[in-house]
């Protein structure tokens, strides 16, 4: 039987480039398990920080070294020149995190190519990336969440007379403490916590430097709970896990510094709460029209028993130590079987 040709696509132009490389290395290892070797011929492709696609030879060098390709940022490049092997792929496994990878742009390209790919389509990816659109979808589905306010860069930078009024509105509608986030960045990039007016002004200015769309959320004292979802039209939820950390909040530095955070699987929470989280995770998956895989993050307010949805990540980190594969491992689905299942889900969705 001919092997299915899988294009493993990693790298990308976002700030999560190195995370993508690590995810791809783990996925390639999973494809090297005997059962997967018999079914799939995996060809890696690398997108550098300029957006250029590189062939399997370069991609393998990057995966071996674990280091991104050194490039000159000021040179003009032809981003439309794809390696010739691209047209031979039967299914793609994109593992690009952040903008230009999991925001619907790449998914649109693969859809135009009329080829199967792992993960959500254009709509699910867009909604899963933009926190404002995501929260609108969650609200429409009746999922409880913290108070939030959507604003734009122009409100922050354009008119110095309007900015103080904006800060007054945030203080009145959301209150302190609050979190200020760029709407379209992942891995907690650009997030700030504001406890007072001075910190709010600085946080808004910082977020505006990252994105033209900004979201302000009410702070809440809660445990951070996560659940993995797998499937297409009939998705299944994993066991529930918890993220614990030693900082004021779960920012980029805490997330990617060894020893600053840890995972607890399964989370030490009541069964009733765990079941509620799993049900809400599936509802969130459907609310954004996700496909294949997603990790859904929640706040569990222990003193009231409330479960509030935080966000959905339609292309979560995929290293051996990432929460998504670890949740499925604890549920009984090993890494190599998970990778196989995701490819099969992609092929099934393409057939429909």
Curated annotation (Swiss-Prot):
Binds 2 magnesium or manganese ions per subunit. Its EC number is 6.3.2.4. GO terms for cellular component: cytosol. Keywords: ATP-binding, Cell shape, Cell wall biogenesis/degradation, Cytoplasm, Ligase, Magnesium, Manganese, Metal-binding, Nucleotide-binding, Peptidoglycan synthesis. NCBIfam families: D_ala_D_alaTIGR, PRK01372.1, PRK01966.1-4. PANTHER family: D-ALANINE--D-ALANINE LIGASE (PTHR23132), D-ALANINE--D-ALANINE LIGASE A (PTHR23132:SF25). This is D-alanine--D-alanine ligase. It comes from Microcystis aeruginosa (strain NIES-843 / IAM M-2473). The gene is ddl.
